[in-house]
Amino acid sequence: MAAARNATNNDKTLKNGRDVSRLSFAKITDTLTVPDLLALQTESFDWLVGNDAWQARVAAAEAQGRQDLPAATGLEEIFEEISPIEDLGETMQLSFTNPFLEEKKYSIDECKEKGRTYAAPLYVEAEFMNHLTGEIKTQTVFMGDFPLMTERGTFIINGTERVVVSQLVRSPGVYFEAAADKTSDKDIYSARVIPSRGSWLEFEIDKRDQVGVRIDRKRKQSVTVFLKALGLTSEEILAEFAGFQSIELTLEKDAILTKEEALKDIYRKLRPGEQVAAEAARALLDNFYFNPKRYDLAKVGRYKINRKLGLEAPLTDSVLTVQDIIATIKYLVSLHDGQTSFTGLRSGVETDIRLDIDDIDHFGNRRIRAVGELIQNQVRTGLSRMERVVRERMTTQDIEAITPQTLINVRPVVAAIKEFFGTSQLSQFMDQNNPLAGLTHKRRLSALGPGGLSRERAGVEVRDVHPSHYGRMCPIETPEGPNIGLIGSLASFARINSFGFIETPYRKVVDGLVTDQIDYLTASEEDDFVVAQANAPLDARGHFVEERVLARQKGGEVDLVPAEEIGYMDVSPRQMVSVGTSLIPFLEHDDANRALMGANMQRQAVPLLRSESPVVGTGMEGYAAIDAGDVVIAEKSGIVSEVSADAVTVQADDGTVKTYYLRKFDRSNQGTSYNHRVVVDEGDRIEAGEVVADGPATENGELALGKNLLVAFMPWEGHNFEDAIILSQNLVKDDTLSSIHIEEYEVDARDTKLGKEEITRDLPNVSPDLLADLDERGIIRIGAEVRPGDILVGKVTPKGETELSAEERLLRAIFNEKSREVRDTSLKVPHGEEGTIIGVKVFDAQDGDDELGSGVNQRVVVYIAQKRKITAGDKLAGRHGNKGVISKILPVEDMPFLADGTPVDVILNPLGVPGRMNFGQVLEIHLGWIAKNGWEIKGKPKWAAELPETAFSAAPNTKVATPVFDGAKEEEIAGLLDVTLPTRDGDRLIGSSGKTQLFDGRSGEPYPDPVSVGYMYILKLHHLVDDKIHARSTGPYSMITQQPLGGKAQFGGQRFGEMEVWALEAYGAAYALQELLTIKSDDILGRVKVYEAIVKGENIQEPGIPESFKVLIKEMQSLCLNVEVLSADGQAVSLRDADDEAFRAAEELGINISSRFESSSIDEI
């Protein structure tokens, strides 16, 4: 895909997709192109399975002499870790080597079509060795199906596309903290050694200057006892920690002399009440920190400990050493003594290392667990379960007959992988609303999930923006609501290193000269340098122009620094933001809260009938669309030899022929239409990486989420009060904002206790009109228009056989036919849905569709498409967090119009801008107007001094790019407004103020004040009124209270809450209130009688007693209060009598309310 990172026409003009170039207002030339935006997912998975792409990267790294890539793949690491599995007597062992994947079973399309998982069988070579005889048996063992990642970074599990989100977790390593003591004014210092798996080790210096240790979060004990247990004598401890008073004080209080005593003392405190054996005591400590099976620092933990403590232990040392523990205690007591640095090793050289307490929210201490590692951890869990089974079988099976195959049970491994993909918090149903939604989902970083934080426990500090996020995680794009700050998005240029830390690129600066060398730095490495921003002015040779340059230092502090002190410089102004945020033009003029909404709302944009890329873009549109993978791209250069709506064939230059198959009107996960549209013609010459066909919401290989509409900022009769939006009828008529939505409905024919369900056209008591569109199988035909209640698939379910009368028995005997006792359980179009049938799939168990599940004989899936025009109540938004609901659609003749007669498309309220501080939208409409009309600058005006040569003139409808933090300036926009190309009449409708005279469409009179008019990019969001509007006549009732259910999904009613009751009480509307609280709600007898009266055309009777009153009485009786209901003459009334009457009345009407199920609905008449 990186091949599609099209060449640039010149430094400033970005060429995206096919023949689309954007005229850029950028002042800075990017030294680095945007990297592959899916690398976070694909590279991690490549490492896990060790495929060809991974092998190529390892070879390239070796050729460059780099050692940063691990040699072993993820699966190799895990099988190596578990090998060998030995029995208790160590007489035999089983080991695994060389895991490999065979050819995949089904293609991606087959998996989606038939609801299967896109996977390949995993095999491993298993070797069984009998130590007694020296016999070795080797077999290749099948370890289950292993899900594969598609090229687009997704997984297909049971036919649905899913994404595994990367997790942000605390890195293993050693951490030092200081906390103020509540009673004294001393700082209490503590240290924690946190492994990847295993027990924590904690040290603490208390207010009495005693050094304590906590093993596995248990009771605190003296650190000198712990050191003695590790084999040090008192003399060695004093020599090692000479000059540290706190250790001397601790040693004075310590009466234990020998290693054995120390071990026993620790054992007593960890396992109180147990008998202490010297061997058990030694084994306990060994198992905690020195046994690789129980304790693992992982490479990253070892790297962090080496770096923090100035050690040089090899990265393969995954357990603690005595040296680590001594170094940790030394660091801690040095901090306590107020020292600022100590001498340690870095890269084999002795250097001074700063003594610091750690900030847990710093990105040097938080790392990413990407897909590969998450799956690896899950396989590890499965293998450790399998290990137990293998050990059991080793002891029970006959040693002569054992082979690797008989020992291994792959079920735990398969179950662990299935569990992860099916139910883990980090394996998510992919957001396919539009290409950007999918791309952002794959680049998401989550602090939640197993081993991470929980929403409830996460404080403000974890959620806050940290200086170390710069260039690594976007400070803007995060959800609103309870997850704010816990879920983020990877910054545009960031990448993950082999330890899982996020790196960001910088240009190296040597003595004030900015070189083209690009180094990727982690947050910890960056702390050692002073970094200048990307727009620091440089001269022609690359030196800083100013003597003192604005730069940031450790901790994010910004200051003016002498040029020669600068170590690095940003590669691009958009380095700090994510892809979603970098698509917002004039981001620098928007308040951060609104920019957050803008970035999030772009992901909710619905793909429209005809996509249109923004006139005012940022230059990121092409990168986003191509890397999202929804655009079909030519793999090789060649000539297009054949084109149809669903396939394009290219004759490549090397003689091969490639056919690209396109997806037509598929349903996305979110129910939007996924459709490819060919952009090449037969006979065209096409280069590798160019666009063959556009996907949803893309135009010519550029992201196209909305439409460029003519917007006026003005009030209009109060109809655009409070962010409401007024639209022109033209947008409805021309289908400008229409979108296609596809719903999927399925029905299963199962085996029931009373017989098989059957899909058929022969339905009991159904009129022929309703069957008109069903074929002979009872399935609706493609192309049929359906409305709510129409039958999609005819299905009958057997009823219980009743005793037959003599006549029926005679008829059966004569005609030899069962007068079938079946009920109609057909699939019908739900309430509020309608559309056209565009597809039907039939799966039959007899045809070997084994994925149907037990007891299912047939499954029919029906797809209904509907075209939704824009309508009042739909939600629209711009890219700056400016959102609103359509309140009125005006006839085009009533819309305000420009002096040349052009009516505006949208009227927005100007009061929505100043309070929200998203001024970028105003600059966008001005630049949109300039780009739509074209311009020509004569001479060299002062305001155009920084404009690139190519931007001095442009034809109408030129697409422009204004990159974030480096876009068009206000004075440039004002100047360009004065030099836009005039209309046919020679008029220039808008001047440098950006405002123009508008005329009232109804009267033709000019409005008193000039109005800001221009082109804004407007998105239609997935909050459509058709999905929300809902009405109920009769429907299901709650089982206990007998009140109607709530919500559209349950076909519920509207709640008349206590505030509404107060309103009617205030008006004294007693009868209306009584009706609402009884017969329209939970007066069972009353509502049945009202229904009867309406059916028969009689007067409605008095309401009865509501069910909730009976529930209240039962509640009080359960609290031992004897509550009775008395009639007017003082007689006790049994509420049961009223119930009996209700059942009798219901029976007469043929309504079954005896079961009082959740769906005891009047529909059952």
From Swiss-Prot:
Keywords: DNA-directed RNA polymerase, Nucleotidyltransferase, Transcription, Transferase. Its EC number is 2.7.7.6. GO terms for biological process: DNA-templated transcription. Pfam families: RNA_pol_Rpb2_1, RNA_pol_Rpb2_2, RNA_pol_Rpb2_3, RNA_pol_Rpb2_45, RNA_pol_Rpb2_6, RNA_pol_Rpb2_7. GO terms for molecular function: DNA binding; DNA-directed RNA polymerase activity; ribonucleoside binding. Gene3D superfamilies: 2.40.50.100, 2.40.50.150, 3.90.1100.10, DNA-directed RNA polymerase, beta subunit, external 1 domain (2.30.150.10), DNA-directed RNA polymerase, subunit 2, domain 6 (2.40.270.10), RNA polymerase alpha subunit dimerisation domain (3.90.1800.10), RNA polymerase Rpb2, domain 2 (3.90.1110.10). One of its GO terms (cellular component) is DNA-directed RNA polymerase complex. Disulfide bonds: none annotated. It catalyses: RNA(n) + a ribonucleoside 5'-triphosphate = RNA(n+1) + diphosphate. InterPro entries: DNA-dir_RNA_pol_bsu_ext_1_sf (IPR042107), DNA-dir_RNA_pol_bsu_external_1 (IPR019462), DNA-dir_RNA_pol_su2 (IPR015712), DNA-dir_RNAP_su2_dom (IPR007120), DNA-dir_RNAP_su2_hyb_sf (IPR037033), RNA_pol_bsu_bac (IPR010243), RNA_pol_bsu_CS (IPR007121), RNA_pol_bsu_protrusion (IPR007644). Belongs to the RNA polymerase beta chain family. The RNAP catalytic core consists of 2 alpha, 1 beta, 1 beta' and 1 omega subunit. When a sigma factor is associated with the core the holoenzyme is formed, which can initiate transcription. DNA-dependent RNA polymerase catalyzes the transcription of DNA into RNA using the four ribonucleoside triphosphates as substrates. This is DNA-directed RNA polymerase subunit beta. It comes from Leifsonia xyli subsp. xyli (strain CTCB07). The gene is rpoB.
